[in-house]
């Protein structure tokens, strides 16, 4: 039988990994699509994408409840017609992590694409490549470090997410409780042993994430200097 502490660690990793993969795919597609649209609609989309950077976690959590709760705009439909309840599930943790990491990943990919020389794309089009082929064979390989850096930042942010997740997913041990929530619960109940255990775990993971990010940044900087 898996111990509760191990379940908490595995759940936190699962939420962080899945949300990071999802936000990577969505961010690449969003940047690619919005890059071809210079209308006001693009500005509105980018404002919505970056909104979570400028509002508190509790406000974000409440907004998500209004949307995904059983009486929410989307949640009511899911519950009525498909008997799906997002709130107080581990999927709520993934959705919250996705929302809070989307600005990090989106802006990282956007910066990468903005730095590319348009000559590459023109050469691809002259060679008969479709826009999707240009994205897959030219754009993505050239911005892979931006994507990796964004993934590292997104994973780290998802690992430490607390406020909005607490409101949408709840703090249910063995079901939705993540490492950050476990530290909060343990400290509230005076269980310093458990709080210190999870503190060490999250710090170790954070240091590993920072080492990977610094390595990617150093490699990118070295490549720029070589040019």
Each predicted region: which residue ranges?
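Membrane-helix interface segments
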Residues: 37-45, 73-74, 89, 119, ...
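Transmembrane alpha-helices
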Residues: 21, 106-109, 117, 132-164
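Transmembrane-helix boundary motif in ABC transporter permease subunits
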Residues: 18-49, 64, 112-118, 139, ...
């Amino acid at each position: 039988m898996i111990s509760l502490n191990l379940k908490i660690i595995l759940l936190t990793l699962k939420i962080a990994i899945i949300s990071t993969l999802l936000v990577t795919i969505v961010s690449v597609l969003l940047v690619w699509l919005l890059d071809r649209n210079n209308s006001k609609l693009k500005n509105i989309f980018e404002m919505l994408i970056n909104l979570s950077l400028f509002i508190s976690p509790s406000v974000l959590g409440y907004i998500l409840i209004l949307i995904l709760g059983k009486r929410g705009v989307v949640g009511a439909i899911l519950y009525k017609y498909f008997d799906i309840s997002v709130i107080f599930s581990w999927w709520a943790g993934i959705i919250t992590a996705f929302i809070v990491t989307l600005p990090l990943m989106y802006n990282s990919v956007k910066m990468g694409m903005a730095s590319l020389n348009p000559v590459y794309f023109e050469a691809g089009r002259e060679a008969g490549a479709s826009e999707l082929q240009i994205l897959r064979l030219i754009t993505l390989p050239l911005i892979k470090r931006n994507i990796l850096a964004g993934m590292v930042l997104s994973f780290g942010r998802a690992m430490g997410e607390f406020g909005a997740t607490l409101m949408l997913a709840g703090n249910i041990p063995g079901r939705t409780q993540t490492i950050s929530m476990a530290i909060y619960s343990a400290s509230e109940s005076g269980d310093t042993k458990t709080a210190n255990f999870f503190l060490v775990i999250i710090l170790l993971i954070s240091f590993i994430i920072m080492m990977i990010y610094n390595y990617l940044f150093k490699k990118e900087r070295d490549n720029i200097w070589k040019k």
